[in-house]
Regions:
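Active-site rim helix/loop that mediates acceptor-substrate recognition in acyltransferases
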Residues: 9-37
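Conserved beta-strand-loop-alpha-helix junction that forms the acyl-donor binding cleft
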Residues: 93-104, 122-126
């Protein structure tokens, strides 16, 4: 997590970095996953419940040695399935706007996310991009 938070702070000012620290990841509204290859951590991701129908994608990060190997897609697909299994209707995320986030943007757009307005407690910020995906309506997967 220290690597993830440090990376966020290298690309965004502190007031625009919304990464969850370890304590916040322990909140009962957050489910955290990690992908390992043997004893090597390949990537992480989390799902934070905002309410009973809306979740937020958090803490998505791929370890440097695993970039461009499908780890982020694997984690994202797993979180999308869990969100659907929990009957969430919408999954949203906040990410950065700097060039270092281009691969993130491509990943989310590839999986059907679209730009949206700030959600939850977020405010408009030139360093933030907000994306959302409608998962299901009336418990039907879209």
């Amino acid at each position: 997590m220290a690597y993830h938070i440090s990376g966020m702070l290298q690309q965004s000012p502190p007031e625009s970095s919304h990464a969850l620290d370890v304590q916040k990841l322990r909140n009962p509204t957050v489910t955290f996953w990690s992908v390992w290859e043997g004893e090597q951590l390949a990537g992480i991701g989390a799902l934070k419940l905002l309410d009973d129908k809306h979740g937020e994608l958090k803490s998505m990060r791929t370890a440097p040695n695993y970039l461009r190997r499908g780890v982020a897609s694997l984690i994202l697909r797993h979180i999308l399935q869990v969100a659907h299994d929990r009957c969430l209707h919408r999954l949203s995320l906040e990410t950065g706007t700097q060039a270092g986030f281009t691969a993130c943007h491509q990943l989310y757009l590839k999986h059907g996310f679209v730009d949206c307005e700030p959600f939850a407690d977020y405010q408009l910020d030139p360093h933030s991009r907000f994306l959302s995906l409608t998962l299901c309506e009336d418990n039907e997967l879209l």
